[in-house]
């Protein structure tokens, strides 16, 4: 099946497409009336697929590109449903809003966490209904609240009295989730606690404020922070959430029915340790809430490993043993994750021009290397003292695990347009 092009399309961007490959569903939505091509591959053929894309490029078209492995997305959803079957994912759109990726997640049952009017409009444009959206931003512009009321997004978060007043004025039928601050951020790469979440002493006053405003507080939300967080952080946060449920009951408020455990999940070892801890904590603290709806806001769990970035070497300089390379994406583009998401990127050579018989330069001597991005800012340095074989201009560097907070947060600085980077679709089967 490898190399065969399968064209799939749907009536709208959220349609579950009926094409199958080897019995496995392939979902990729029609975008703005255009079909997308999905290439089925064996798991170890992704590199060959990338080489085929590079080979088909014109001599003057060496722009970076992504490959989205839809097979990886299916695998991750299967892992989620197996490990946390009673927790409904609301994918964090901010992490990566690539259209076919969102359509795939939607087709597999994911709902969506949006933080702005623009994100809500984007999700709705894919045919996804507003009742599948949580407006998970505790501090929203009044204009966004008015928009949410107009189109029927009726679940949001809050952690301040002023937010209650805005919602009471503009969207009184909206159900609220009280965002609380976890006791620990679990050593997350991107902690959320300094900015969001009610402190313990603020919880009862905030519940009373919502009660006085005649708003419905349906439950509690928290976020332990993004990226590699210690799974034990979920334990304390879930226990604290239960205390909020009890406080609301003591105040005579309607019984809470929703618990939002936020994000912070990373695929791999962190998830395999976090999922049992979450299940255990929920059983301990919420076993007497059989009708409880539990949701989560995973972003990088689904996005990070599903995307691979290919970049061209556009410049080279040799200083003794040190090899310096310039590539056509960098810290002002996809690699902004190095600065803002505290990510560590890795690179694999693809010597399409200089060594076609040994694309990965296996067995070749390696040298300490620096990889710069394309802009004129010296800060735009992707890798330092990184071991690479000697490469040439027009060779390529491949960056795996580039789906989380990459293209979505890139800029157009110096005229390098991150948003213009094309994404190719593949469906890789496990070996």
UniProtKB/Swiss-Prot annotation:
Pyridoxal 5'-phosphate binds at residues 226, 264, 297-300, 405. The keyword Lyase applies. Its cofactor is pyridoxal 5'-phosphate. Pathway: Amine and polyamine biosynthesis; putrescine biosynthesis via L-ornithine pathway; putrescine from L-ornithine: step 1/1. It comes from the Eukaryota. The active site is at 376 (proton donor). GO terms for biological process: putrescine biosynthetic process from arginine, via ornithine. Its EC number is 4.1.1.17. The record marks 223 as: Stacks against the aromatic ring of pyridoxal phosphate and stabilizes reaction intermediates. Belongs to the Orn/Lys/Arg decarboxylase class-II family. This is Ornithine decarboxylase. It comes from Solanum lycopersicum (Tomato). The gene is ODC.
